[in-house]
Amino acid sequence: MSLSRLSLAVAAAAISLTAAAAASAAEVQISGIIAEGFYYTNPAHGDDAFKMAGYKETPWDSALNMKGTEKLWDDWYVGFHVGSTIALDTGSLANQDHLFGSSRLFIGNNDIEFSFGRIANFSCATQPYSVYMRLRANLTNASFTGIAPANVTFNAPENLDNAIAFSTKGERGFFLQGLYSNGTETQEKNYGWSDRNIVAQLAGGWTGEKLRFGTILSWEKPDRLTADAPEKHDTFGTHLIASYNFGPVVSAVTYYHGENDWRIGAAPDLKNQMVGGEAYNQSAKGLRSNAVVITAAYPVGRHTFTGALTYGKFEWQGNKEGLEESEGSVISGGSVYYYALSKRTRLYLAASYADGDKLLAKPARFNQFMGAAGMMYNF
């Protein structure tokens, strides 16, 4: 057994023993979601595929979470959270180089909470501090391509290492959140501060009984790991989000504008399939991005009908040598239907279609039909 696998096994055993011992001294909860089904894609430039759903191919990824809290004094508390995302079709960890995809120590009170560790950015549907969830930006509650807003807005490829975050609390009223990450563990060891990928976000808004609105300001300093490549300009992204509960229909609108984006969403296909590695590496400027996403949900009894419509326009500002197209757009739409078998178990049926042109004509996620069906169980 390799040292890395042995260390993971020892760590897992230690955590199990620690959790059992800690249960008597603090409140420890184990929760998660198991989602599986079938997934079909028919890309415009490739063969269609029908298979058992894997990672990122169900509305929510299968995950296991363990959270413990202990009261300190007055209304102050301290706690921890660790979680692993699982590819259920293979039984493997989605982030195979991490025992836990997310891990944090937190301390707070009734008004504010601070966290330290490996934490998700605000502009996705991953807890603990998802502004998308707080403002109901994605009412489909699904991360499918052609549906989720995070596919075309600022989104970190993975949860952020070395992160510090805070968030005010409360279900109603104004809120404020902040996050800072100074790069991955490997970059921290091997590169100086000026060479590492660094991310910061600040978000604020209002959550009312019917109306919710707010903004996310994102800043990212791209890494510079090749000495002879030009230094890339920093990314600045702005989200404007609003949602309203019309009763029973709920609707949300998200607008995103980005300057010097170095990816669309979390995928690496800007470099791999759109502008090419040479132009990407030799560019100081990135994408200018504009996207609008509208989502809606209509719950009625055991049924929930949801839909999403997206339009995005992107212009490459960097090295254009050899490029046939330097700008492009995508329009996509989709729907997800849920049927509640019980309080914990739901069936889902989803479909989406995306059509990208010019710069966005090659990536399959912008040019395909997608269909999915399956079951999710929460515990």
Give the role of each language-model region.
Residues 51-62, 98-101, 158-162, 196-200, ...:
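Residues that define the transmembrane beta-barrel architecture of outer-membrane proteins
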Residues 32-38, 80-84, 116-118, 178-182, ...:
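Transmembrane beta-barrel strands of outer-membrane/channel proteins
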Residues 14, 65-67, 104-108, 165-167, ...:
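Outer-membrane beta-barrel architecture
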Residues 195-197, 201-332:
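Detector for outer-membrane/organellar transmembrane beta-barrel domains
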Residues 1-25:
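Gram-negative bacterial Sec-dependent N-terminal signal peptides
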Residues 367-379:
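Outer-membrane beta-barrel "beta-signal"
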Residues 28, 76-78, 111-114, 172-176, ...:
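Repeated loop/turn-to-beta-strand initiation elements of outer-membrane beta-barrel proteins
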